[in-house]
Amino acid sequence: DVYKRQVNNRSEGLNFRVYNNKDIEFLDVRDQSGMRTYVRSLCFVLFKAVTELFPEGKLFVEHPVSKGYFCNLRIGRPIELEDVKRIKQRMQEIIAENIPYHRIECHTAEAVRIFSERGMNDKVRLLETSGSLYTYYYTLGDTVDYYYGNLLPSTGYLKLFDIVKYYDGLLLRIPSRENPEVLEDVVKQEKMLDVFKEYLNWSYIMGLNNAGDFNLACEEGHATDLINVAEALQEKKIAQIADTIFHRGENGNRVKLVLIAGPSSSGKTTFSKRLSIQLLTNGLKPFPISLDNYFVD
């Protein structure tokens, strides 16, 4: 199924009207842009279902993990399996009703008023700090939300999904990009989940719960403080790694080799130098070797 179009190399929704000759490429979930459109539309269905079932609840789609998207649902009590079943059933009903997504363009001040009346303060801060005179928002029935990007024409386009209880939250499962007819397998990523939780905790401590909070902090001149805290936390983590390596040697399990892996330009060499400095403070003498300097001819 087609979920998005590239019109003259520009991403457009399926509702975009073409009046002149243009180069058009149709995209499905095997394309990254098409998958993002599918996920955004599915998240709106999830938001609508949660809003109807738990009017006082708060839903946060936080980060991709375990080949899906981890969601934090706050309803004043722990999430139970019955809650997840009700949410999934309501999502299936919304999809079966084939409700259209409507994109509405308006003055930013009007959009701020609409979201403010609904208590969606995160959207209010985001729009107030966007610097745009005009903006847009989406409606799905009587539910309103803001998404940075195109959505599908209607909920009937969403053929495949699942939502399951995952640790203390929910996992929104999506189709596989390699085989859109099946869902992605759930891959346990406990360490990745712990890293994301730590990041969210630090963001909460610093008062940065969303992009709007970050924009406001920058406007108020706190950008340097945010950078310094992030660098200090990174240095603290590297020091903890160096301490772990040192203490293993004290217990007779001397570490002789430390491997640092990552994609191109991800900071591997910089990380190795920072780790070397911390190892030196522990009385160890490291020898960093960058394998980028060695290639097979």
Task: Tell me what each language-model feature is.
Residues 2-3:
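Short, small-residue-biased leader/transition segments that mark boundaries at the very start
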Residues 8, 16-37, 49, 58-65, ...:
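Auxiliary tRNA-acceptor-end handling modules of aminoacyl-tRNA synthetases
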Residues 258-260:
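Hydrophobic anchor at the beta1->P-loop junction of P-loop NTPases
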Residues 265:
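Walker A (P-loop) phosphate-binding loop of P-loop NTPases
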Residues 268:
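Conserved lysine of the Walker
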Residues 271, 275:
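Hydrophobic positions on the alpha1 helix immediately C-terminal to the Walker A/P-loop
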Residues 282-297:
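Short beta-strand-centered segment that lines the nucleotide-binding/catalytic pocket of NTP-utilizing
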